[in-house]
Amino acid sequence: MSRGALIVFEGLDKSGKTTQCMNIMESIPSNTIKYLNFPQRSTVTGKMIDDYLTRKKTYNDHIVNLLFCANRWEFASFIQEQLEQGITLIVDRYAFSGVAYAAAKGASMTLSKSYESGLPKPDLVIFLESGSKEINRNVGEEIYEDVAFQQKVLQEYKKMIEEGDIHWQIISSEFEEDVKKELIKNIVIEAIHTVTGPVGQLWM
């Protein structure tokens, strides 16, 4: 039995990640494809993260980074098991979000990546570019919904993309929605059909 693919959607806030994940779940109906999003706010760490994001509580940046990281590690075994059982996972945000946001706040990218080192490695990361309209929508109730901060996050994403150690697929914001939806579906299908070998370890 071939293993499943780990396919991650990344991008700035309000770039359409969840929408595109749901499009995939609807357009490729299968009992071998599941959706997972981070942070998982139902866990102990997830509830602490939710309190922070919604400004109910404050923590120093180091604690925040570790909370997000721990939230992903809580699901590392689940992800590994699902992939080995032939289940493809469509993941809305992953370690790259954690590193980009931490680095945008001034943390060391190398140190931030070390916290995530060893997580299941994605077979594909789809990065959704944000047009000016999407970026300017980044004003909201949650703590990171700030235009200037999101621009800093974007620069950190670009650094990771340029490293070239992960298979990134950048989707332009210029595409019409129906074109974007079809393009992403085809990219995902190809990734599912071409996945080979054991599950890798991220940043090892």
Curated annotation (Swiss-Prot):
EC numbers on record: 2.7.4.9
Biological processes, Gene Ontology terms: dTDP biosynthetic process; dTTP biosynthetic process; dUDP biosynthetic process
Protein keywords: ATP-binding, Kinase, Nucleotide biosynthesis, Nucleotide-binding, Transferase
Keyword ATP-binding: yes
Binding site for ATP: G11, L12, D13, K14, S15, G16, K17, T18
Superkingdom, natural source: Viruses
Pathway field: Pyrimidine metabolism; dTTP biosynthesis
Presence of keyword Transferase: yes
Record Gene3D superfamilies: P-loop containing nucleotide triphosphate hydrolases
An example molecular function term from Gene Ontology annotations: ATP binding
Reactions catalysed, as given in the entry: dTMP + ATP = dTDP + ADP
One matching Pfam family: Thymidylate_kin
Family: Belongs to the thymidylate kinase family.
Protein name according to UniProt: Thymidylate kinase
Organism name: Cowpox virus (strain Brighton Red)
